[in-house]
């Protein structure tokens, strides 16, 4: 098995892609790319990620910060920037599979081996190393020279613990993994390590960095600075936990239903880089927990009290009991972790230490999940690495026996104030509490009740924590999944049962699920409601008292920064993270900055977006910032009481109708809607000015924005919206010109219309009914006349059919008059014809032989929706129209199956004595748009345009300012813009003419270093201020006048004789020196047309021979036809006309046939004219049954029977 896998790995490595991982100067990872559409990936992190001490001066120092992490604003951390040169990729030998350990017969089954096409890959990349200063920044384009790094030195002793500035403990990491960009905001977090944490090796191999920490006053945790915790930005509920100890990156990301793992490979040949393995496990709810799959004890062993087996199901009746006192908010589990000799030997002592601490950091974060409602902190006091198995400790296949032995051993070691107590009592005092939990990590494949290997990965005593001889856990090393195993087993040790034991929680996939422990069907990192109640039941019991007896010094003082990320990274810097260093925030979209971050890349005219809002804390207005996609005040709003509504949120759109919402906090533990006595969230319609003409529809805009998000840089794939009637509030998009709808998002943005017609609007992914009165949830509806709550009697319906079947070109169907509503034109069947529509102006659909794609068009004052799916078409418009519309059909030679149209027009006008009073319009001044910035750099201003608007019947339009002359016009709003400093650059004039008109000469130009002022004026600057070398001011040239001209030959005949083709000619330079001017070279080929030989003779098939025996004749049809149109003509050459007749020779006629026994074919042909078989289905059977002799059958199958007689004659002859 190992050899086969190794061969596959070697093959895969030869075709893998490897990309550069780099950093911006502010510590943000700018590029970390993976090969697309793979469940398992490999990436090589550059040498800049190696953890090397760096002093503030740039040389080697004593900082414990990993070299690849730079805290924003922190001191003492290295600055690293990606090298811009190309990289060489080569394959290397793969890491061999795990060897059997102590009689183990096969490799581990958890996690399962990768399937076909998902094998591990190992690559090594040559990186540009650091300069002499250790971790100095490498600028793009630096020389690709390097020296091998010096031999590894033992890390120096860490400095005393210091309180780092909050800004220096966070880093923003960008990972474009699995076809999407993930932005991780990580904070340094070593809270799981106690200040007196120590690592001990038994027996002690001697002094070294991992030797026993026996000093009476050990320093701060030596590994606390290389652990990071955080989440994925804009993904609430996500979790990220990583370690950078040792120079690599190890940990996991939980995002929705995916678990993404990153771990370094053991590649000692990688001198300048660290190969890493990146893979994911996706949650699958397809595996229902059946009776077979519910046997989770196969993977997890739970030992209850001695001699008393634990019940498989937990009674539900006692779970509703509430206790009168409130639980404390924080519990601490002071833990000792032991690694068995097989674990230490497999990884190596130093690597085992880093790996185990990484796992424990992940376990710490699993217990921090808010679903527990109680804070449970893992505090690691000591890590013991066993190089030899103690005589009194049993490590073997029998899991229950091993657990019992380990509990007894740890009690002897830590249960009596000898060892760890004696080391720490000097500083902690004699009242120090005992160890709360002990964990043994082993490489031994064990089984619960059998002395043989099996699939069990963890075993623990149920509710054994704090008990002297039952506070034990054993977990098998199965990679990064070990963190989930330890968290799961610690849950058992704190009295938490499997979710499968609770009928109400058996269907979920949480940490305590029986499926979860396998590591094959991970759910999420939350704890179920049943686990929460089991834990609360344990914490309320006296068995949990030790978790409250925590020494204050064991609480790590690392503080999580409270600063929002948008306060650290401006909008311009966030754009640089998304689109590169030449990007900046698009000032034109300042008014909608919180709904989506729009960026402009230098050199491009249009703004880009990825539809994601900016980071929380980004400035959006004076005294306001963005939070959760909304522009809110920086001053925190007072918390409202339970059940009290919050303020209405800003409108989801800036033009046209949108959605606004408000929420309220609900009483109860779960804050569910049922505790609110009504909905927890309410929505309402908010009106805005109409969107400017010419902009794409809101749904199309979302698709177009997504096209920038997913397209490759070389080929921008444009998308257009496709409406799915079953899921109107999901975003389906199709490439322009193709009918291939793809679901790009489960939810469209709030305020998107549910369809092309109607008022219904999408809110939170659901279509909300909107009445014609503009109220959400209203039952008011327009009648087909367009009257809200009307009776349908104010208009009449005009409908009809158009059945013009054949023709070519545009044919007018009808003219739809002005004032029409509810226009609908539908093809009866798919056809090759095209519907066309045109108003009195220049607006049209499918006119002038130009066929449009599906979309919305503005014609005659209304929005017309055109839909084409294959050959079927539909046109619809709500109206009313302000001008007549001409409906046409573009016909071809194919069949047109007709179309149906209908619309409504107002009924007869009111009598003269009646009048309909028109509603009075409302005029007001509004800020409609922003002017351009008055400076391109150096700081400028931009103002709003104040326009007079007319509001009438909920329609808003811009009118002449005279309408608002009696109103006070507000001052325009002013904002600063383009505050970036103006750059210096070289400016050159045009080259002067060559000094000689023929032959070699010189030409010159003026070169100066210039700088642009804020008003656009260019001034001369010092040459040393310009970047790059000074361009040349003189160059050699050669006069062109003495050069001879090109000589062109005669055009050849056209390449085709019927249609468009190409003709050629020869062009040569007559100058002996061959220095003719290429720009004046005549063309050698051009298009041509020749229709001289379009008519050709077309021949039909030869007919059958005129007789059945002897000599006869055959004929065929000869026609003169046009090659392209297929029309008949008389322009074919008669000399080239093929023959229409030819003789045919069959076998000689046999005159010996007895005419009394068989009907002669000639006689039959004379008496009956054969027009073909009348029963073609049965004629073959009649022939086989020899019924052709009967004249009755012959008449019905004369054609088949002729051949029958011919065979008979041939056989007898």
Curated annotation (Swiss-Prot):
Extent of Acidic residues compositional bias: 110-119
Q: Which residues form the propeptide?
A: 28-322
Alphabetized PROSITE patterns for the sequence: ADAM_MEPRO, PLAC, TSP1, ZINC_PROTEASE
Location of region: Disordered: 49-161, 192-215
- Location within or outside the cell: Secreted, Extracellular space, Extracellular matrix
Segments of skewed composition (Pro residues): 140-155
Alphabetic keyword roster = Cleavage on pair of basic residues, Disease variant, Disulfide bond, Extracellular matrix, Glycoprotein, Hydrolase, Metal-binding, Metalloprotease, Protease, Repeat, Secreted, Signal, Zinc, Zymogen
Q: List the disulfide bonds.
A: 407-472, 447-454, 466-546, 505-530, 575-599, 586-607, 594-626, 620-631, 651-686, 655-691, 666-676, 994-1037, 998-1042, 1009-1026
Q: Where is the Disintegrin domain?
A: 552-639
Please name the disease the record associates with this protein.
Cardiac valvular dysplasia 2: An autosomal recessive form of congenital heart defects, characterized primarily by congenital stenosis and insufficiency of the semilunar valves, although mild insufficiency of the atrioventricular valves has been observed as well. Other features include subaortic stenosis and dilation of the ascending aorta and/or pulmonary artery in some patients.
Glycan attachment residues as annotated in the record: 266, 803, 913, 955, 1015
Instruction: List compositional bias (Low complexity) regions by residue number.
Output: 120-139
PTMs? The precursor is cleaved by a furin endopeptidase. Glycosylated. Can be O-fucosylated by POFUT2 on a serine or a threonine residue found within the consensus sequence C1-X(2)-(S/T)-C2-G of the TSP type-1 repeat domains where C1 and C2 are the first and second cysteine residue of the repeat, respectively. Fucosylated repeats can then be further glycosylated by the addition of a beta-1,3-glucose residue by the glucosyltransferase, B3GALTL. Fucosylation mediates the efficient secretion of ADAMTS family members.
Catalytic site residues? Answer: 489
- Cofactor binding comment, as recorded: Binds 1 zinc ion per subunit.
Which residue ranges does the record annotate as region Spacer?
A: 797-920
Q: Which residues form the Peptidase M12B domain?
A: 331-551
What cofactor does this one take? Zn(2+)
Instruction: Provide the protein name.
Output: A disintegrin and metalloproteinase with thrombospondin motifs 19
Taxonomic lineage from the root: Eukaryota, Metazoa, Chordata, Craniata, Vertebrata
Its Gene Ontology biological processes? aortic valve morphogenesis; collagen fibril organization; extracellular matrix organization; mitral valve morphogenesis; proteolysis; pulmonary valve morphogenesis; tricuspid valve morphogenesis; ventricular septum morphogenesis
**Which EC number(s) does UniProt give?**
3.4.24.-
Expression by tissue: Expressed in fetal lung, but not in any adult tissues examined. Expression was detected in an osteosarcoma cDNA library.
**Written domain comment of the UniProt record:** The conserved cysteine present in the cysteine-switch motif binds the catalytic zinc ion, thus inhibiting the enzyme. The dissociation of the cysteine from the zinc ion upon the activation-peptide release activates the enzyme.
Gene Ontology annotations for the cellular component aspect, listed alphabetically? extracellular matrix; extracellular region
């Amino acid at each position: 098995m190992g050899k086969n896998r190794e061969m596959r790995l070697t093959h895969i490595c030869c075709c893998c892609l490897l990309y550069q991982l780099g950093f911006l100067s502010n510590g943000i990872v700018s590029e970390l790319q993976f090969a697309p559409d793979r469940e398992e990936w490999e990436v090589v992190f550059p040498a800049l990620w190696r953890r090397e001490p760096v002093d503030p001066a740039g040389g080697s120092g004593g900082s414990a910060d990993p070299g690849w992490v730079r805290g924003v604003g922190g001191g003492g951390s290295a600055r690293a920037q990606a090298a811009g040169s190309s990289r060489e990729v080569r394959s290397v030998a793969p890491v061999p599979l795990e060897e059997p350990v102590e009689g183990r017969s096969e490799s581990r089954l958890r996690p399962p081996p990768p399937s076909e096409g998902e094998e591990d890959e190992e690559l090594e990349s040559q990186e540009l190393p650091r300069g002499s200063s250790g971790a100095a920044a490498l600028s793009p384009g630096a020389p690709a020279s390097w020296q091998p790094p010096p031999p590894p030195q033992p890390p120096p002793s860490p400095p005393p613990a210091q309180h780092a500035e909050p800004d220096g403990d966070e880093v923003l990491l960008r990972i474009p993994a699995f076809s999407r960009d993930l932005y991780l905001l990580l904070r340094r977090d070593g809270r799981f390590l106690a200040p007196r944490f120590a690592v001990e090796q038994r027996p002690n191999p001697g002094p070294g960095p991992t030797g026993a920490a026996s000093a009476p006053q050990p320093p701060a945790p030596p590994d606390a600075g290389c652990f990071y915790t955080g989440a994925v930005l804009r993904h609430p509920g996500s979790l990220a936990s990583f370690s950078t100890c040792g120079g690599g990156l190890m940990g996991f990301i939980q995002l929705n239903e995916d678990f993404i793992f990153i771990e370094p490979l053991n590649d000692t040949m990688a001198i300048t880089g660290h190969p890493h393995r990146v893979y994911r496990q996706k949650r699958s709810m397809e595996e229902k927990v059946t009776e077979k799959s519910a046997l989770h004890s196969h993977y997890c062993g739970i030992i209850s009290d001695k001699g008393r087996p634990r019940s498989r199901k937990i009674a539900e009746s006692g779970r509703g009991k509430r206790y009168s006192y409130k639980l404390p908010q924080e519990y601490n589990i002071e833990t000792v972790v032991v690694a068995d000799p097989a674990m230490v030997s497999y990884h190596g002592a130093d690597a085992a230490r880093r790996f185990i601490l990484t796992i424990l950091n992940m376990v710490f974060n699993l217990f921090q999940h808010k679903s527990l409602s109680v804070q449970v902190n893992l505090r690691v006091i000591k890590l013991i690495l066993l190089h030899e198995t103690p005589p009194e400790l049993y490590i073997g296949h029998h899991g229950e026996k091993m657990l019992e032995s380990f509990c007894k051993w740890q009690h002897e070691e830590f249960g009596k104030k000898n060892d760890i107590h004696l080391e720490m009592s000097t500083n902690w005092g004699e009242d120090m509490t005992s160890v709360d939990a002990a964990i043994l990590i082993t490489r031994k494949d064990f089984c619960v009740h059998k002395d043989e290997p099996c699939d069990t990965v963890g075993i623990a005593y149920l509710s054994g924590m704090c008990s002297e001889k039952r506070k034990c856990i054993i977990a098998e090393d199965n990679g990064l999944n070990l963190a989930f195993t330890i968290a799961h087993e610690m849950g058992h040790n704190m009295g938490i049962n499997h979710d499968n034991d609770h009928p109400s929680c058996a269907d979920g996939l949480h940490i305590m699920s029986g499926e979860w422990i396998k590591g094959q069907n991970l759910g999420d990192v939350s704890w179920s409601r049943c686990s929460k109640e089991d834990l609360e039941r344990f914490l309320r019991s006296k068995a949990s008292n030790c978790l409250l007896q925590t020494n204050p010094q064991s609480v790590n003082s690392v503080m999580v920064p409270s600063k929002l990320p948008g306060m650290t990274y401006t909008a311009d810097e966030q754009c640089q993270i998304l689109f590169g260093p030449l990007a900046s925030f698009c000032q034109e979209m300042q008014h909608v900055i919180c709904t989506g971050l729009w960026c402009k890349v230098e050199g491009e005219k249009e703004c880009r977006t990825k539809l994601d809002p900016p980071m929380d804390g980004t400035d959006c207005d004076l005294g306001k910032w963005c939070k959760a996609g909304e522009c809110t005040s920086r001053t925190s709003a007072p918390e409202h009481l339970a059940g009290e509504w919050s303020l209405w949120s800003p409108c989801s759109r800036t033009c046209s109708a949108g959605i606004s919402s408000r929420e309220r906090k609900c009483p109860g533990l779960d804050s569910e809607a049922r505790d609110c006595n009504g909905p927890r969230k309410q929505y309402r319609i908010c009106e805005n000015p109409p969107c400017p003409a010419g902009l794409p529809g809101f749904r199309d805009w979302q698709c177009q924005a997504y096209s920038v998000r997913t397209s490759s840089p070389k080929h921008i794939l444009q998308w257009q919206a496709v409406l799915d009637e079953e899921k109107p509030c999901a975003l389906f998009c199709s490439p322009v010109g193709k009918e291939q709808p793809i679901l790009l998002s489960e939810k469209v943005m709030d305020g998107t219309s549910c369809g092309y017609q109607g008022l219904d609007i999408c809110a939170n992914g659901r279509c909300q009914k909107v009445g014609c009165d503009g109220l959400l949830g209203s039952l008011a509806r327009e009648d087909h006349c367009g009257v809200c709550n009307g009776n349908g009697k104010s208009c009449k319906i005009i409908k009809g059919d158009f059945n013009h079947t054949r023709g070519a070109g545009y044919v007018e169907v009808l003219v739809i008059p002005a004032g029409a509503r509810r226009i609908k034109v539908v093809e009866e069947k798919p056809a090759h014809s095209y519907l066309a529509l045109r108003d009195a102006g220049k607006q049209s659909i499918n006119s002038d032989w130009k066929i449009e794609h599906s979309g919305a068009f503005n014609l005659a004052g209304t929005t017309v929706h055109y839909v084409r799916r294959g050959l079927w078409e539909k046109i619809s418009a709500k109206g009313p129209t302000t001008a007549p519309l001409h409906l046409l059909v573009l016909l071809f030679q194919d069949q047109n199956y007709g179309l149906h149209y209908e619309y409504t027009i107002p009924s007869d006008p009111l009598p003269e004595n009646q009048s309909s009073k028109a509603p009075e319009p409302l005029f007001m001044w509004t800020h409609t748009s922003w002017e351009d910035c008055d400076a391109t750099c150096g700081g400028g201003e931009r103002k709003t345009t104040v326009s007079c608007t007319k509001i009438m019947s909920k329609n808003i339009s811009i009118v002449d300012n005279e309408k608002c002359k009696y109103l006070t016009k507000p001052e325009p709003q002013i904002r600063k813009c383009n505050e970036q400093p103006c750059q210096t650059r070289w400016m050159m004039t045009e080259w002067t003419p060559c000094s000689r008109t023929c032959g070699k000469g010189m030409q010159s130009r003026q070169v100066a270093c210039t700088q642009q002022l804020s008003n656009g004026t260019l001034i001369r600057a010092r040459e040393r201020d310009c970047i790059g070398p000074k361009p040349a001011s003189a160059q050699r040239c050669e006069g062109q006048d003495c050069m001879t001209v090109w000589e062109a030959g005669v055009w050849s005949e056209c390449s085709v004789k019927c249609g468009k083709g190409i003709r050629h000619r020869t062009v040569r330079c007559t100058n002996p020196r061959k220095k003719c001017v290429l720009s004046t070279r005549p063309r050698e080929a051009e298009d041509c047309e020749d229709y001289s030989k379009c008519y050709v003779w077309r021949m039909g098939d030869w007919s059958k021979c005129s007789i059945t025996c002897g000599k006869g004749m055959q004929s065929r049809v000869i026609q003169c036809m046009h090659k392209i149109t297929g029309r008949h003509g008389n322009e074919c050459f008669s000399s080239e006309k093929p023959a229409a007749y030819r003789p045919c020779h069959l076998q000689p006629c046999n005159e010996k046939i007895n005419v009394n026994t068989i009907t002669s074919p000639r006689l039959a042909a004379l008496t009956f004219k054969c027009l073909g078989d009348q029963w073609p289905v049965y004629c073959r059977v009649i022939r086989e049954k020899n019924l052709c002799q009967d004249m009755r059958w012959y008449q019905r199958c004369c054609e088949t029977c002729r051949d029958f007689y011919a065979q008979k004659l041939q056989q007898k002859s």
